[in-house]
């Protein structure tokens, strides 16, 4: 048994075994991280997911689960998709603004070149 229980074991009010699947990813000093993931996915499901993954990919999977769970808590309807949609909208607006600015620059350059040509005639 670990002398310091991980956040998951503290939250679940159980002993933290040496081979606890949660302890490397849910440190005791960040209990909200596990609480959020548990609220959305459940401890059993997260445990099963982690056990099915190779050790080298578990940390990334936990970070992804935490991010997705936080998004789902913040926006229960859309979750991460809401953020993706917002970013796509911002990209589209920025692309439109860039195209407009480039067109204005082209018009200004054309006027400037016409002014220089008329000055020489």
UniProtKB/Swiss-Prot annotation:
For the LOB domain, which residue ranges apply?
4-105
Q: Which Pfam families match?
A: LOB
Query: PROSITE patterns per the record?
Result: LOB (PS50891)
Q: Which InterPro entries match?
A: LOB
Q: Which residues form a coiled coil?
A: none
Family, similarity comment:
Belongs to the LOB domain-containing protein family.
Q: Which PANTHER family match?
A: LOB DOMAIN-CONTAINING PROTEIN 23-RELATED, LOB DOMAIN-CONTAINING PROTEIN 4-RELATED
Please report the name of this protein according to its UniProt entry. Answer: LOB domain-containing protein 23
- What organism is the protein native to? Arabidopsis thaliana (Mouse-ear cress)
């Amino acid at each position: 048994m670990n002398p310091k229980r991980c956040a998951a074991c503290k939250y679940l009010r159980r002993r933290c075994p040496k081979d606890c699947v949660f302890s490397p990813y849910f440190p005791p000093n960040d209990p909200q991280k596990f609480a959020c993931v548990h609220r959305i996915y459940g401890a059993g499901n997260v445990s099963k997911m982690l056990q099915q993954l190779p050790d080298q990919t578990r940390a990334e999977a936990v970070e992804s689960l935490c991010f997705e769970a936080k998004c789902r808590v913040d926006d229960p309807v859309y979750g991460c998709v809401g953020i993706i949609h917002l970013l796509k909208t911002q990209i589209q607006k920025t692309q439109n603004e860039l195209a407009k600015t480039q067109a204005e620059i082209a018009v200004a350059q054309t006027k400037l070149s016409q002014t220089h040509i008329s000055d020489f005639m």
